[in-house]
Amino acid sequence: MNNLKWVAYFLKSRMNWIFWILFLNLLMLGISLIDYDFPIDSLFYIVSLNLSLTMIFLILTYFKEVKLYKHFDKDKEIEEIKHKDFAETPFQRHTVDYLYRQISAHKEKVVEQQLQLNMHEQTITEFVHDIKTPVTAMKLLIDQEKNQERKQALLYEWSRINSMLDTQLYITRLESQRKDMYFDYVSLKRMVIDEIQLTRHISQVKGIGFDVDFKVDDYVYTDIKWCRMIIRQILSNALKYSENFNIEIGTELNDQHVSLYIKDYGRGISKKDMPRIFERGFTSTANRNETTSSGMGLYLVNSVKDQLGIHLQVTSTVGKGTTVRLIFPLQNEIVERMSEVTNLSF
């Protein structure tokens, strides 16, 4: 079937030749019908010989010229095509040389842009790490504040700054996340408690508590740093859009897969917003005057979840709250997926 495709392409590209040769032969036959002195038997012999030689010529040309395009169809690198001299005609060699120059130039641009991105990533990372030092010092100064009301307000703002810095750091590292992952069995409960501790100043100000219920074995095979980032972003959203209601957190077992749910009783997400919640920079169409949200939290979650093999489910009702469920993969599923990614990279 594939050969028939190439034959069809070849005949279509040579259709002008074929029509011209047929026209010349028909013209000779037409002349023989008008000129009775012209030997008809000799003419038929000439036409038959001409068509036969044309057929042989087309077959030989087909095998010679289609060879290059079959290599293109196999997605071979242009360097291999050029250095192995798969191009046989002058026009083919000119085409391959042009493609080689263009692709080489684009590759150089990609390498240059990648170096610039790496430098940008390094600059942002160093900036965040550097600014963490005065932020940590600020926390020590806040802890010395005697006025509890003022101290709580300062800790609330400090927690927001610290959270935004961490978010920026994760955004910067998104491109290199695959190189930055190490999978192991870790405790979901431990990760959740650690993240709750980081948000306690915000939850206290907003009058929000946490109902934690881990019913099943909570150990999952994942990368602890990126998994904590996902939990942090979901908790941050739950706190941001809730007030004076507890947030429920727990684990369940479904088809041997451990799932973690985080349920809040906040404003909820409208049906028209639901398809867009993972878009970069999207906040909400319901509260356009709100400036505290960056729209990066769920974008980060969505960008990382596939690398961790996590299946994400979000259900929400306006005015009643939102439930986010993280379904974790088994170890063999992660190993199999990583093997597929490795094979594709080669």
Swiss-Prot record:
Protein name as annotated: Sensor protein kinase GraS
Function comment: Member of the two-component regulatory system GraR/GraS involved in resistance against cationic antimicrobial peptides (CAMPs). Functions as a sensor protein kinase which phosphorylates GraR through the auxiliary protein GraX. In turn, GraR up-regulates many genes such as adhesins, exoproteins, transporters, toxins, and proteins involved in cell wall synthesis. Down-regulates the expression of many genes involved in RNA and amino acid synthesis or glycolysis.
Matching SMART domains: HATPase_c
Molecular function via GO: ATP binding; phosphoprotein phosphatase activity; phosphorelay sensor kinase activity
Record-annotated Histidine kinase domain positions: 126-332
Transmembrane parts of this sequence: 15-35, 43-63
Leading EC class: transferase
Organism: Staphylococcus aureus (strain bovine RF122 / ET3-1)
